[in-house]
């Protein structure tokens, strides 16, 4: 198809959307404004967002190549058809983060599933994606759906799909779902019902928190509270959960960045809410400069990743995802010695230092493809074979960690807790995290 054919196709689809949207529909005004911006119109309609192993992710706006209610509802009808074609009485749990439209898209997703007679649990507040992963198995659901675009800029949102084991779909599932989606029209054949959507039970929250606390390394209270932490949820879903966990382990010597404490879909003080970027810590460093402190801990908007930054020798320093994972592994090996036959699971692009540390402590290393879903798939296999005790630690270089296999996904809440306990432990010996990292480099090389 040449460019003229592509333009014609986009124009035809644009006119179809013009004929269907009413003033009450989302992005109605933006749709009509596209006639004055042909390049943007072309980009919005020349193709469709493609459903894959990460579900959907795209820019918010009108069009087939954007995230909007019509795309979400169509996708969900395809998901419903897939479920009903494979499971007699399916059930789904749905969550969402702090992004623009996330709560609306979560409700629309729930309503389409209910219209198809599917049992639906919907969180009534934003929450970490790890809680969704845990909830899938806790409530014996066949699928989980999370409305999120993780740490992308504010113009994005997305739609992640998890299987009944609590990790993102892999294998043939994405392609099978895509085939069902492609059969659906954006404006017809989509079932919809708002009644019968179930709230997630409070017991799930309590059980999830207990599992997080089981990961604690139980640092002495005096040592723990000698560490001063600045915490930022980067205007995302992690705030209340991380604070609750800090308080539950008896840790009170922390301050939260006020401008980033509560949900803000515009991410006004952190245009790139990504804990892998030093820029994301600017507000936190400002608080550290004025009030003092030892480290900054940040969780991303859906709170499945954690990052750490600090002043080392007077310089603002970001602990990279690889470095933080190495530090966690080193720390755990010293305070919670591995048992025989336990393994570390890492992505193929993760630091080879993992292998050297693991060898010293008798751990085997298993490499997986990039993406924590492949580690999650392994966790599901271990559970199926009653071998979960083989799991010691798992991480990927992009700041995703899991210290115990209580879910099949990475978790920023428990990793934030572990980061604080680890930093407090090393501070008791007069070292910050970079000091300890340099000692590791001296011992193993880098």
Which residue ranges define each predicted feature?
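Short beta-alpha connecting loops at secondary-structure transitions
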Residues: 158-169, 194-197, 265-272, 308-317, ...
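N-terminal small/polar loop signature for handling phosphorylated ligands or for N-terminal nucleophile
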Residues: 93-156, 252-308
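Phosphate-binding and adjacent anionic-ligand microenvironments
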Residues: 293-295, 335-336, 340-446
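Conserved phosphate/anionic-ligand binding catalytic regions in large, soluble enzymes, centered on
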Residues: 45-65, 149-150, 229, 233-245, ...
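Gly/Ser/Thr-enriched, mixed-charge loops and adjacent short helices
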Residues: 17, 22, 40-45, 49, ...
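Short glycine-rich phosphate-binding loop at a beta-alpha junction
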Residues: 90-97, 228-231, 342-348
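An N-terminal, well-structured beta->alpha segment
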Residues: 3-109, 116, 198-226, 237
């Amino acid at each position: 198809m040449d460019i003229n054919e592509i333009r014609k196709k986009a124009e035809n689809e644009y006119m179809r959307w013009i004929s269907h949207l009413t003033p009450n529909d989302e992005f109605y005004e933006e749709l009509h404004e596209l006639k004055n911006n042909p390049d943007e119109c072309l980009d919005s309609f020349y193709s469709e967002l493609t459903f894959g192993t990460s579900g959907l992710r795209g820019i918010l706006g009108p069009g087939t190549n954007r995230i909007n209610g019509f795309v979400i509802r169509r996708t969900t009808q395809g998901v419903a058809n897939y479920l009903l074609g494979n499971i007699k009485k399916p059930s789904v749990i749905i969550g969402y983060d702090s992004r623009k439209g996330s709560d609306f898209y979560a409700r629309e997703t729930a309503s389409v599933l209910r219209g198809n007679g599917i049992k639906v649990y919907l969180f009534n507040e934003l929450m970490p994606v790890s809680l969704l992963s845990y909830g899938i198995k806790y409530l014996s659901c066949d699928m989980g759906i999370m409305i999120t675009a993780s740490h992308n800029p504010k113009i994005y949102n997305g739609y992640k799909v998890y299987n009944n084991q609590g990790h993102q779909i892999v294998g043939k599932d994405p392609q099978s779902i895509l085939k069902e989606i492609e059969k659906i029209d954006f404006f017809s054949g989509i079932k919809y019902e708002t009644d019968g959507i179930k709230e997630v039970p409070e017991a799930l929250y309590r059980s999830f928190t207990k599992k997080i606390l089981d990961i604690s390394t139980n640092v002495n209270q005096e040592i723990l509270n000698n560490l001063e932490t600045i915490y930022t949820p980067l205007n995302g879903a992690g705030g209340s959960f991380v604070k609750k966990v800090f308080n539950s382990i008896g840790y009170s010597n922390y301050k939260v960045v006020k401008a980033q404490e509560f949900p803000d879909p515009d991410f006004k003080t952190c245009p790139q809410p990504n804990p892998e970027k030093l820029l994301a810590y600017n507000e936190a460093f400002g608080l550290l400069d004025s009030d003092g402190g030892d480290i900054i801990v940040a969780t991303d908007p859906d709170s499945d990743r954690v990052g750490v930054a600090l002043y080392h020798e007077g310089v603002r320093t970001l602990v990279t995802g690889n470095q933080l994972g190495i530090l966690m592994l080193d720390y755990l090996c010293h305070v919670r010695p591995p048992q025989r036959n336990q393994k570390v699971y890492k992505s193929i692009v993760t630091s080879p230092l993992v292998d050297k540390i693991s060898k010293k402590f008798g751990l085997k290393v298993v490499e997986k493809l990039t993406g924590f879903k492949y580690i999650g798939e392994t966790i599901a296999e271990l559970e199926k074979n009653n071998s979960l005790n083989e799991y010691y630690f798992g991480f990927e270089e992009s700041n995703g960690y899991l210290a115990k296999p209580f879910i099949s996904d990475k978790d920023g809440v428990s990793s934030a807790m572990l980061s604080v306990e680890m930093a407090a432990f090393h501070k008791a010996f007069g070292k910050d995290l970079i000091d300890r990292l340099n000692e590791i480099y001296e011992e193993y090389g880098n």
